[in-house]
Structures are given as C-alpha cells and as structure tokens.
Regions:
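Short coil/turn segments at secondary-structure boundaries
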Residues: 29-32, 76-80, 126-129
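Short secondary-structure capping micro-motifs at structural edges
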Residues: 2-4, 44-49, 69-72, 98-102, ...
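Structured partner-binding subdomains within large eukaryotic complex subunits
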Residues: 101-195
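Conserved catalytic cores of phosphodiester-cleaving nucleases, focusing on short active-site segments
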Residues: 16, 57-68, 83-84, 88
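Eukaryotic short linear interaction motifs
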Residues: 23-27, 67-75, 121-123, 131-133
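Eukaryote-biased feature marking scaffold/signaling PDZ-domain proteins and nuclear chromatin regulators
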Residues: 11, 56-58, 72, 79, ...
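Acidic, metal/cofactor-coordinating or nucleic-acid-engaging core segments within structured domains
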Residues: 68-105
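Charge-rich, low-complexity intrinsically disordered linkers/tails
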Residues: 1-57, 66, 151-195
C-alpha cells in the first residue's frame, strides 16, 4: 500500500489485497478524486489509493506459518491485516466525511480480512466508530476455524465467504463509494497563489 497515507511508520504490504481499479470509476469520478490523490505516478500519498493501480481496498489476506513465525503466526497475520484494513476503512470514512455523509458508514463493515496458516483461518470484518471528529477503528470476528478438521469438511468455507464478498457485498459497497464521489465538487483547486 505504497500510495496510502501511513497510519504509523511502516506501510502495510499484505500478501494479497483487493480494491477497485482506476478504470472502475468514470472519467468524471476520477476528475473529482484527482485533487485528493495528487500525482500518483510520482508517489503522492492519498487516503483513497492503496497503490497506483488500486483505489479503496476492501479485502486483504495474510498467510503465516508456524515454522517461520512460531505459535503466534496467526496473531502476526491478524495484526498485519488490521493495519491494512484500518487504512482501507479510513479511506471510506474520509470520503464520506468530505461529503458530510459519515453517519452512513458509522459502525458499518467496510472491509474484510482473512488470516491463515497451514491449518487455521480467521475471517474479520473491519469498521469504524465515528464520534464527531474522532474515528476509532475495530474488527469484528466473523469466523475462526481449522480447515483440516473433520477430514477437511471446512476446506471450501473461506472460498465461499470470499466469493460472497465479491458477488454480493462488493457491488453494493462500490455503488456507495461512487455515490459519495459523485457528490464531490468538480474542479477543486488546492494551488496557493504566490505572495
């Protein structure tokens, strides 16, 4: 997430992440976002961009193994996912704050994460609690399980969940983001004239 305004010193680098391509937005929407993105090619930072090709990420996955990380492998993956998805949730909150609609995203799940190792999976939903100008970020555990139990009975559970995020949740989330972008004023100019 090398174009995202950092939360702390280290920028997240999830094993896998999903967001929206630049081309997912109309030319008019990209123009409205442009003042808040800057020149992404030269490395300007933005709340709305994770990388130069991904806007508004909504899913990350981290894979860790006990061999490399010890018994705390999943905890490490959870922390990395929490960092990545805090930036993702913050992006949506800041967009909605710009158009005075932040109440619509208060306490709503705005991103998901999957942490796993060679036998266990943890799935979380990430959301913000907005109290005036203060925003706090949280995660809600959706499911934790061992996919090797019961002769692999749960081996497709994460796939089915992720497919549901793509097919059901994501289109609604995208429409919500687009509706906020459409309310941004056109042709904002942040240039400061010389004295």
């Amino acid at each position: 997430m090398n174009n995202s305004i950092p939360l702390v010193g280290t920028r997240p680098q999830p094993d896998y992440s999903v967001g929206f391509k630049r081309e997912a937005f109309t030319e008019e929407q990209r123009e409205k976002l442009a003042p808040f993105i800057g020149d992404f090619i030269t490395g300007d930072w933005s709340y709305f961009m994770a990388t130069h090709y991904m806007y508004f990420p909504f899913l990350t996955c981290e894979v860790k193994c006990e061999v490399m990380c010890g018994a705390a492998a999943l905890d490490i993956a959870d922390r990395k996912n929490a960092h990545s998805m805090t930036l993702a949730v913050r992006a949506v909150v800041e967009l909605f704050r710009l158009v005075k609609r932040e109440k619509e995203v208060n306490r709503e799940i705005l991103a998901f994460s999957v942490s796993h190792d060679h036998r266990s999976v943890r799935i979380y939903g990430h959301y913000a609690v907005i109290d005036g100008s203060k925003t706090s970020f949280y995660r809600h555990p959706i499911r934790a399980f061992e996919f090797t139990d019961l002769d692999g009975k749960e081996k497709w559970t994460t796939y089915k969940f992720t497919k549901s995020v793509y097919d059901t949740w994501m289109p609604t989330h995208f429409k919500r983001i687009c509706s906020a972008i459409n309310e941004l004023p056109s042709k904002i100019n942040f240039d400061v004239s010389p004295l």
